Amino acid sequence: MAFSSLSPLPMKSLDISRSSSSVSRSPYHFQRYLLRRLQLSSRSNLEIKDSSNTREGCCSSAESNTWKRILSAAMAAAVIASSSGVPAMAELNRFEADTRGEFGIGSAAQYGSADLSKTVHSNENFRRANFTSADMRESDFSGSTFNGAYLEKAVAYKANFSGADLSDTLMDRMVLNEANLTNAVLVRSVLTRSDLGGAKIEGADFSDAVIDLLQKQALCKYATGTNPLTGVDTRKSLGCGNSRRNAYGSPSSPLLSAPPQRLLGRDGFCDEKTGLCDVK
């Protein structure tokens, strides 16, 4: 009786083979569809078995367990067979590695604490790369792209960054003594607590860069040239000779470059006792 109830299962599988192409072209959707049909098939077969047991009363609980194991094995085999067309995770990871970086828009290379001294990496793409605490002494990075890269605490003594794109980079606490920044673009870069003593900055663009006040004053003593890419004068990008002080101050030294503070009372008016009410 148990074997006679197996006949509906091949009939269902034939229906699946004919209609699978119309349900979905994706192997994943076909797998879900196949599982659903198998579940419905198992339910119908169990109902048939229950009705036959009611009529004849010849099937025991052992036969019922055997029938369930047969259905489970059939469903497992169907799942394994249908999953052969689904791309493996290894293939997806390989595709992501080929695109490089976050959403394929950068190198995301890792050079943290790496020894890159006296190496040549000119005209390369280091966008969003990590150079934290890297040794970059006397290396050649001319013409390379560092847009959005991390260079905190890197040592770049006498390194060549001429013509490089260093915009939007984090370069705080860097050692850039005697580094070559000729015609480099450092727009919106963060250079707080970095040492640029003796650096070559002819034609460099420091527009909206965050630089310590004392470091900026030292660079303004010999800043010259115009950046060939942005057309911005180096002295103008540093704010050299500007009589107008920054109203907000520099993040590294707000009290030195910002206007004197006006102390307000609890009601929002200036406290005459402070002596700062007449400050303009």
From Swiss-Prot:
Stored PANTHER family: THYLAKOID LUMENAL PROTEIN TL20.3, CHLOROPLASTIC
Organism: Arabidopsis thaliana
Entry-linked InterPro entries: 5peptide_repeat, Thylakoid_lumenal_pentapeptide
Gene: TL20.3
Transit peptide stretch: 1-59, 60-90
Protein name: Thylakoid lumenal protein TL20.3, chloroplastic
Boundaries of every Pentapeptide repeat domain copy: 124-163, 169-208
One Pfam family this sequence matches: Pentapeptide
Compartment(s) where it occurs, according to its Swiss-Prot or TrEMBL record: Plastid, Chloroplast thylakoid lumen
Keywords, in A-Z order: Chloroplast, Plastid, Repeat, Thylakoid, Transit peptide
Predominant cellular place of this UniProt entry's protein: plastid
Subunit structure: Interacts with thioredoxin. Interacts in vitro with LTO1.
Parts forming coiled coils: none
Cellular component per GO, a single term: extracellular region
Its biological purpose: Pentapeptide repeat protein of unknown function. Subject to degradation when reduced.
